[in-house]
Structure formats: structure tokens, C-alpha cells
Amino acid sequence: MTVVGAALLGLMTGLHTATWGAYKDSPFEGFKWTSYLRSVVLGMGIAVGIAVTTTWTVDLHPVVIVGLVYTFERLATEWWKTIVRRDDQSAYTIPMRLGYRGLPVDNHAIRYTVGVAVIVGLIIACAAATTMEHALPSEPRWATILIGGVGGWLTAAGGAWKDAPIEGFSPWKFMRSPVIATAWAVPLSFLTNDWAILALCAGGFSVASIETYKTFFTGGRPPGKFATKPAIHRVPRLRRVLAVQHTGCWVALAIVVSATALGPLPV
């Protein structure tokens, strides 16, 4: 796959992640071009960065690249919102900034220390998975699939830390990410057997699947972060456009899967 091909995959992935945030949040805070374009630019930038700095676009299936872009874009965006961004937390029912027992942590030193620790921890976890994989004489399929679900467990832990002090702990909500990530790991394990890459990729597709469900299949329920806030913007036409775009991105991904079944992508 060329750099152009990677950029196109990144564009598709970035457009996809941009749709669910804009669809859910626009009735409460209006449509923000900066937030929308952030995901698009990040998706393309991450995909191009992968193509330029690694051999993954040669070694890995395009669908795996898409899953990795989902993960890295979401990690970058959520890390920025949790650690770096300075905005009025009273606008949210659930604070978006790093919190403790439901209250935002305003101390910059603490937030940045936690932010760095999260990055280092993820790097160590990926390195440990790779080391453990290479140390085994063989890689049982069941072990590969279970490792592939680790991204879902990490997502669940982060979500519970943020949401549970406000909403209460929901076992169903907590288990949703691990179960779906593990389910994604089953087909993805036929495309890559690298444990770290599989866990990252399955975690990304788990987020995309859950966000699709929460955005379009919950009967218009407001996102948790705005649960007690009024919807002050009427944007039905915009939301219809975003829904079509979101569906189109899933269709585009299906086309990529079908095309690669016939041979390498032409770009």
C-alpha cells in the first residue's frame, strides 16, 4: 500500500470517528468544525505516519491498519481532552477532564503525570505482549483471541473510572467493551497474529461498533456527558447528513474488505 492509499484509509477512518461525536453532541453544544476536522486530520496524519515510519502498510492487512487508526485517533483525542484541554467542566454532566470520584482534577502537574504514566504504561504493555508472544514455543488460538480482547478491558476500566462516580457502576456497560473487543479479535486474528497489534486493532473496532450503537440505536438517548443538560440546538438536517456519512464509511470499509479478498489494493 502506498502513502496515498494509507492517507485514503486514514481519511475514511477520520470521517467515521468525526460523525458519531458531531451527531451526539451537536444538539447540546452546536456543530463545531474544529472538533469535526480534528478527527479527520488526525486519522489521515496517523495513517500517513504509519506508512512513512513503519512497514505496517506492507506487512499488515488494510483492515488491520484501519483498526489501528481508530485506536490511535481515539487515544490521542481522549488523552488530549482528559489531560490537556482547558474548558468549562460545568458544561458537562460527567467531567471530561481527568477526574477523581466524579470531580475534575484541576492540578496541571497531577494531570500531566497521570497522562505520561498512561502513555508509558501502554508502551510497556505492548512490549510485554510482544515479549511473551515470542517466548512461547507456539501461539494457541485461544490465547491470541483473549489477548486481542485486552483493549476492551482497558477501555472499560477507563470508562468506569470516569462515568461510575456519576452514573453508578453498570456491570453490563463495563463488560460490553471486553466482550465486543474479544468478538472482533476472532476474525481479526486471521489477519494478524501479532498480539499487541491485534489488541490495539480489536480495541479500535470495538470502540467504532459501540459508538455506532450508542449514537444511532438507543432511541435518541442523550450521551452521558450531557445527560442532565438541555438540547438547545435543533440540527435535524445536519444529523441526517452525519448519519448518511457514518453509514457510508461502514460501507466503504466493507468494500475495502471485499476488494482485498480479491488481491492487494491498487493504491
Model-identified regions with their sequence ranges:
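Final/C-terminal transmembrane alpha-helix of multipass membrane proteins
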Residues: I110-C126, R240-P264
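Membrane-interface segments at loop-to-transmembrane junctions
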Residues: E29-V40, Y92-H108, G168-V179, F226-L242
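A cytosolic-side transmembrane-helix exit/cap motif
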Residues: K81-P95, A164-F169, T215-P230
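Generic multipass alpha-helical transmembrane bundles of integral membrane proteins
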Residues: P95-G168
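Alpha-helical transmembrane segments and their membrane-interface exit regions
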Residues: L68-E78, G151-T155, A202-Y213
